[in-house]
Amino acid sequence: MRRLRAGAFAAALLIGNAALAHEGATGIVKQRMDEMERVGRVVKRINERLKSTRGLADIARDAEEVQAVAARIPSLFPPGSRDGHSEARPAVWERRPEFEAASRALVEESGKLAAAARSGEEPAIAAQFRSVTQACNGCHDAFRARERR
């Protein structure tokens, strides 16, 4: 349960600071910020569903939404797309294979979450949700700059 709260906290931070970070962003930078905010909202929704144990059947659809965005992540970071609004570290472009591997990890883990959700087994869903949030955090730790305040 502690890890579920940590995942929800991470999602809340992502959503809470998104409005400030998006101010002035345009083009691909705004698009990727919007997509990351979308993932944050979906992760938060999954966490809420797990806490209430209602809507567990909907988690598969939520996980598939995360998976679809995760599959597009590398294309949202083309060369030369770092500007003053971007929260991306230069490592995104300097360590591209590692960045793409982190994206693939989120695709894989969110796919496993969808499968776990279809099983209806709450413990399996919760365990796999933790793996999804770990994939998110792993990428953010390596490739996302700290929140601007």
What feature does the model see in each segment?
Residues V132-F143:
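The canonical Cys-X-X-Cys-His
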Residues R144-R148:
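Short, charged, intrinsically disordered terminal tails
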